[in-house]
């Protein structure tokens, strides 16, 4: 298990681990992050800070990532202003930052190098044994599991994760070993910058298709290119249960280990059972004794994520005892099927869960896990669609999967910088689900009214889940932190959008 460490604001942080600095970055003194509050950006910033670099950054608002980095010694300002970058050696930008941002404009004027997040991650990985986890779904969970298994196996990895690893209290840490475990982002094809020693592909699904000009074949080609960034002695660990991954196997010219429930998987799960939030299964590997395991995560999709961790760990020589212990004691990740609270109302006792899944496949997996683990509970979902383009492109899939819950509340689309698209909004989605005839969805035009609307629908023994990748995480926290039925909940607007009422 990765333990939490004390975070303090110390002037010694800037000289904390200079021996671990990237050798060829010796001329770099101050690294400035534009959009430092994002999980991926903040994670890389934390590792670089602990390597001894001066870190500064800017974002549009305070969050836990910003507060943590400040406590570690980073200089962070709220708001994007040209003067923020004047003393920087290099600028790191997230994909959410557009070219007209005043800090980018000033950096180009001063000829300060501007790199994307993945390029900086690639530099961290260059002189380490990199393990990069790619795929449409499950990257954060799989990365967290691998980091936890390696830590339990005394390998002390550096890790950069797109979510909060609960046992560590952070999403990034500088380890003492040669291992670096990190997510590889396909959303903008920036994972092609990475040159790891081991690459994992959890699955391939249609998402972020604007990056690939709407061409699924181009998306598949890009995954093959990612795998072929491995050296000839590298290893591809891939989920053979995913039909697209299976289709691509003949095109992979690197050593491959497959995993899954399929009979022909190299690392195979059998005898799957789910008991509440715990999944039990047996791992079979040819030539080895079967290994009974439990992972503190619900659902078959999470067993697949665990299998990826088992496959990578076994290849790196982690013993079975450490693997089993890490999975059994795994404390989860923030916003990945995270139980927030048990609560009581006039209607009875209930539980509140929060989940990041925002693609129809992810929502479907969550619903299945809940049905299997808690078959006696009614499922009440509060869903916030993420991006108008995704809602448009996967509209019928959303209608189908969201119709499978018992009670549905739909918040307005989280735009993430996009312009609204006609008939790809939550009101249209609610109308289509209603016409399907399975459930009667509730469109929530004013998020402040959500507690009162929930109160009219809740029943004893319900399981309430807040689902989505946008500002709904703040809604979930407010519901958990206050009385669900008597306290108004609000959402802090992000840089791109606000949740607006229909008045």
Swiss-Prot record:
<dbReference type="InterPro" id="IPR000713">
    <property type="entry name" value="Mur_ligase_N"/>
</dbReference>
<dbReference type="Pfam" id="PF01225">
    <property type="entry name" value="Mur_ligase"/>
</dbReference>
<dbReference type="GO" id="GO:0008763">
    <property type="term" value="F:UDP-N-acetylmuramate-L-alanine ligase activity"/>
</dbReference>
<feature type="compositionally biased region" description="Low complexity">
    <location>
        <begin position="8"/>
        <end position="18"/>
    </location>
</feature>
<dbReference type="InterPro" id="IPR004101">
    <property type="entry name" value="Mur_ligase_C"/>
</dbReference>
<feature type="binding site">
    <location>
        <begin position="135"/>
        <end position="141"/>
    </location>
    <ligand>
        <name>ATP</name>
    </ligand>
</feature>
<protein>
    <recommendedName>
        <fullName>UDP-N-acetylmuramate--L-alanine ligase</fullName>
        <ecNumber>6.3.2.8</ecNumber>
    </recommendedName>
</protein>
<feature type="region of interest" description="Disordered">
    <location>
        <begin position="1"/>
        <end position="22"/>
    </location>
</feature>
<keyword id="KW-0573">Peptidoglycan synthesis</keyword>
<keyword id="KW-0133">Cell shape</keyword>
<dbReference type="GO" id="GO:0005737">
    <property type="term" value="C:cytoplasm"/>
</dbReference>
<dbReference type="InterPro" id="IPR005758">
    <property type="entry name" value="UDP-N-AcMur_Ala_ligase_MurC"/>
</dbReference>
<dbReference type="GO" id="GO:0051301">
    <property type="term" value="P:cell division"/>
</dbReference>
<dbReference type="Pfam" id="PF08245">
    <property type="entry name" value="Mur_ligase_M"/>
</dbReference>
<keyword id="KW-0436">Ligase</keyword>
<keyword id="KW-0132">Cell division</keyword>
<dbReference type="InterPro" id="IPR036565">
    <property type="entry name" value="Mur-like_cat_sf"/>
</dbReference>
<dbReference type="GO" id="GO:0009252">
    <property type="term" value="P:peptidoglycan biosynthetic process"/>
</dbReference>
<dbReference type="GO" id="GO:0071555">
    <property type="term" value="P:cell wall organization"/>
</dbReference>
<dbReference type="GO" id="GO:0008360">
    <property type="term" value="P:regulation of cell shape"/>
</dbReference>
<keyword id="KW-0547">Nucleotide-binding</keyword>
<dbReference type="InterPro" id="IPR050061">
    <property type="entry name" value="MurCDEF_pg_biosynth"/>
</dbReference>
<keyword id="KW-0131">Cell cycle</keyword>
<dbReference type="InterPro" id="IPR036615">
    <property type="entry name" value="Mur_ligase_C_dom_sf"/>
</dbReference>
<keyword id="KW-0067">ATP-binding</keyword>
<keyword id="KW-0961">Cell wall biogenesis/degradation</keyword>
<dbReference type="GO" id="GO:0005524">
    <property type="term" value="F:ATP binding"/>
</dbReference>
<dbReference type="InterPro" id="IPR013221">
    <property type="entry name" value="Mur_ligase_cen"/>
</dbReference>
<keyword id="KW-0963">Cytoplasm</keyword>
<comment type="function">
    <text>Cell wall formation.</text>
</comment>
<comment type="similarity">
    <text>Belongs to the MurCDEF family.</text>
</comment>
<comment type="pathway">
    <text>Cell wall biogenesis; peptidoglycan biosynthesis.</text>
</comment>
<dbReference type="Pfam" id="PF02875">
    <property type="entry name" value="Mur_ligase_C"/>
</dbReference>
